[in-house]
Amino acid sequence: MQTTPGKRQRRQRGSINPEDIISGAFELAQQVSIDNLSMPLLGKHLGVGVTSIYWYFRKKDDLLNAMTDRALSKYVFATPYIEAGDWRETLRNHARSMRKTFADNPVLCDLILIRAALSPKTARLGAQEMEKAIANLVTAGLSLEDAFDIYSAVSVHVRGSVVLDRLSRKSQSAGSGPSAIEHPVAIDPATTPLLAHATGRGHRIGAPDETNFEYGLECILDHAGRLIEQSSKAAGEVAVRRPTATADAPTPGARAKAVAR
C-alpha cells in the first residue's frame, strides 16, 4: 500500500534552493519510491509551487541525477577500504557493507544500481575509489589483471544480489508472488528428490539470501587467496634459481691469479 506523503506548510516564494529540493526528494522517495516520485508531488511535499522546482531541475531525470551524485558521495564512498595487509577480511567487510548499504535503502538501489546514471564527476570519483582498491589488491600479491577481475567479481556479486532482491520485493509488492522455480509445487520429491532434500534443509535456488551471498563471496575470496599463494610461490622459485651477484663475481684472489697468467 502506497504511503500518502505529508503536506508541509507552504514556503515563501524564492525560499527554496537545490539542496533543499534534493533533500526533500529523498524524503519523498522513501515514502512513495523513485518510480512514483513526481515533480508535482514533490512540490506539495516541500510546500512550493512546481515551477520553483523546474527553475533548478527542468525534468525528473535531472533531479534523479543530482540525487544519484549525492547518494554516491554520502553513502557508497563511505564504505570500508580494502587494505593490502589484511586483504581478505577487509575485502569481505567491503562487500558486506556495500550490500547492506543498498539493501537497507531501496532508494539508493533504484538510483545507483538499477537506474545507473552517473555524472562525469561522480563517475571519476567512483573510478578513483576502484583504483585504490585494485592497487591494494596488487600490493597484497595479485597481478593487475587478477586484482581487477577479483574486484570486478565482488562488485558484480554484490550488485547482482542486491538488485535481484530488490526486484523480487517489487514483484511481491505488486502481487506477482515468488518465482516459478521457488514455488513449492515446482519441487516434487518424486521427480526432483535432490532439490527437495536440499530445499528441505533450508537451501534456496537462485535466491539473493544471506546463505547464497556468503557462499559466493567466500568462493571469490578463496580463488583470490589461491592466486596470491601461486604468485608468491612462483616468485620464491625464481629467487632461488637466480644466482646472487656475489656468487657470480670472481674473488680478488682469483682475479689476481688470472692477471698473473
Swiss-Prot record:
SUPFAM superfamilies: Homeodomain-like (SSF46689), Tetracyclin repressor-like, C-terminal domain (SSF48498)
GO biological process, one term: negative regulation of DNA-templated transcription
Cell location: Cytoplasm
Keyword Nucleotidyltransferase: no
Pfam family, one: TetR_N
Low complexity bias locations: 241-261
Induction per the UniProt record: Autoregulated.
Keyword annotations from UniProtKB, A to Z: Cytoplasm, DNA-binding, Repressor, Transcription, Transcription regulation
Function: Negatively regulates the expression of the efflux pump Rv0191 upon chloramphenicol exposure. Acts by binding to the Rv0191 promoter region.
Protein name: HTH-type transcriptional repressor Rv1353c
